[in-house]
Amino acid sequence: MSSIHVASMILLLFLFLHHSDSRHLDNVHITASRFSLVKDQNVVSSSTSKEPVKVSRFVPGPLKHHHRRPPLLFADYPKPSTRPPRHN
């Protein structure tokens, strides 16, 4: 792969990680962990082992909104110069 392909892949990965909503990812993680806990409990109840089984329950706290400023558009990046033009 050329360096342009590598740079574009890194940029896409960064943008995906930057724009993915952390609250949405937490909700997905919570539902996935609850689903796996239900499956684990079913497996444990059918087994006859006498070892104490620890089931860690993840209790979500209040979701805090992180105040982030909106990302700049690419059109805003070449910022206009604040220096007055020189008159020759």
Swiss-Prot record:
Q: Which GO terms describe its cellular component?
A: endoplasmic reticulum; extracellular space
Q: Does the keyword Iron apply?
A: no
GO molecular-function terms, A-Z: growth factor activity
Q: Which residues form the propeptide?
A: 23-75
Region forming the signal peptide: 1-22
Task: Give all cystine bridges in this chain.
Answer: none
Q: Which UniProt keywords apply?
A: Differentiation, Endoplasmic reticulum, Growth factor, Hydroxylation, Secreted, Signal, Sulfation
Q: Where is this region: Disordered?
A: 44-88
What further note is attached to this protein's record?
Answer: 'Golven' means irregular waves in Dutch.
Protein name, please?
A: Protein GOLVEN 10
Upper lineage: Eukaryota, Viridiplantae, Streptophyta, Embryophyta, Tracheophyta
Q: Which gene encodes it?
A: GLV10
